[in-house]
């Protein structure tokens, strides 16, 4: 047993230090990033925010809506190949180029991924997603998927330390997904005692990935636009959002009317709700590691994504970053004990 003494930080522990800026307006800030990925050689241009691959967030409807803003969607893995075929027929190139095809690591998952990717050459992203990215099986699976899809962009995770980021990139991942337990409906840290404060995880994993020419996704922990900006400031190339995009018309969650008000069900993908729906219940050898909540129905996602991107633009103006890619270079975080004045409640 050993104890690491170095302080680890989450988004709530810091604020950006403002810096002199030549920008006159938020409209001058460019949030578009351009990446050339390490293994596939693919080039991609867009706003590097991703809707999470949860079945009450990462829907086909969400993908079409967010593509209008240049934003990506990791479509959840519970759609059938037939569902994908219908989506591919109805979606334009810009939408398909901004979609990640999510998969687990079973033999059935591999075959399904092959079937889905064969539907269109415009599907270029594969998201290999398991809760514990420290498994040797994941490394082997990444190698297998890379061999089968040499020209596709492969994301794999989730992990929170630089050593495993490096191993996954060397195995063939272009992007590594970073985050264990920070999500709004995730209870892994409570059930297992395992985790890592998300901002420190992003900072350390970004350093490891960029040294090898890889990229990272900061997955989870964002509660407001300022947190999204902090993730980018910490070095995340992409930021994945679940709870911030849940509850919207496009999210695909179950609508429930209670006492005359409309709510949408939102749950973690290791929750009892998810396992009852997709796995026939919680297996006898495991515990549920997610919660189920009812969110007030929020209408269309377009206003919310504009608010998120507007917040990030404003961050950039405060620190003098004319482009999103400059934000991490312009970032100085200060440690704080308070974030905001809550005398009239939280926004």
Curated annotation (Swiss-Prot):
GO terms for biological process: purine nucleotide metabolic process. One of its GO terms (cellular component) is cytosol. InterPro entries: Aldolase_TIM (IPR013785), GMP_reductase (IPR050139), GMPR (IPR005993), IMP_DH/GMP_Rdtase_CS (IPR015875), IMP_DH_GMPRt (IPR001093). GO terms for molecular function: GMP reductase activity; metal ion binding. The active site is at residue 186. K(+) binds at residues 181, 183. It is an enzyme of class 1 (oxidoreductase). Its EC number is 1.7.1.7. It holds the Pfam family IMPDH. It catalyses: IMP + NH4(+) + NADP(+) = GMP + NADPH + 2 H(+). Keywords: Metal-binding, NADP, Oxidoreductase, Potassium. Catalyzes the irreversible NADPH-dependent deamination of GMP to IMP. It functions in the conversion of nucleobase, nucleoside and nucleotide derivatives of G to A nucleotides, and in maintaining the intracellular balance of A and G nucleotides. Homotetramer. Belongs to the IMPDH/GMPR family. GuaC type 1 subfamily. This is GMP reductase. It comes from Vibrio cholerae serotype O1 (strain ATCC 39315 / El Tor Inaba N16961). The gene is guaC.
